[in-house]
């Protein structure tokens, strides 16, 4: 199967090449979801990886320490927030629709609940976290024994996503539920993924104009 995928692999997203002080580097636009047939990058991306001595990721999600830290935001002093009953019921409805384990989901921070149902909903568009470019890049670097580094830390990501005023967080969940209930969430996901896959930089740069995720002051913070 891997050989078939590798033979049919095409370059997707955007790959920049830069040079400084006689050294060459590459910048690649990765994404957190993917399709099985996209799992292996195309020849130009593979060549860039092979020519690189180090692979620097947003966050190395195959690192066991990172995985442990991401699984427990409380270790960073981030407190969980209970959803008001109306929002909780709406979340449960969405969770059942995307086949999420309702009881387990309810124990997560509300933002993680929203992220989880969004990722699970993407499966209906044949998109999976397990086929994301970050997982391939990290696995490739490990297999090739290249240096791996992260630009961010688990704590930074957790604080960026989850820390904040409870009112703002609940407003974010409200906006997310509205997108799901209107049927627009999947449309937006597919539009973003297609823009990434085709390397449509103009569409990606206009993301905030069409994502319907910047409608409130909280969204724009």
Where are these regions (language model features)?
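Structured, acidic catalytic/metal-binding patches in enzyme active sites
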Residues: 1-220
């Amino acid at each position: 199967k891997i050989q078939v995928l590798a033979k049919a692999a095409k370059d997707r997203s955007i790959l920049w090449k830069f040079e400084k002080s006689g050294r060459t580097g590459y910048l690649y636009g990765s994404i957190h979801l993917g399709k099985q047939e996209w799992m292996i990058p195309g020849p130009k991306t593979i060549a860039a990886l092979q020519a690189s001595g180090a692979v620097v990721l947003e966050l190395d999600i195959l690192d066991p320490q990172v995985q442990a830290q991401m699984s427990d935001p409380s270790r960073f002093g981030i407190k969980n927030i209970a959803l008001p009953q109306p929002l909780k019921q709406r979340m449960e409805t969405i969770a059942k629709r995307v086949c999420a384990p309702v009881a387990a989901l309810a124990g997560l921070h509300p933002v993680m609940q929203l992220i989880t149902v969004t990722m699970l909903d993407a499966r209906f568009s044949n998109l999976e976290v397990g086929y994301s470019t970050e997982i391939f890049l990290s696995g490739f670097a490990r297999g090739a024994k290249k240096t791996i580094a992260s630009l961010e830390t688990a704590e930074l990501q957790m604080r960026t996503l989850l820390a904040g005023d409870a009112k703002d967080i609940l407003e974010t969940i409200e906006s997310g539920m509205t997108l799901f209930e209107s049927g627009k969430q999947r449309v937006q996901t597919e539009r973003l993924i297609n823009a990434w896959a085709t390397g449509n930089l103009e569409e990606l740069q206009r993301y905030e104009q069409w994502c319907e995720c910047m409608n409130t002051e909280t969204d724009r913070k």
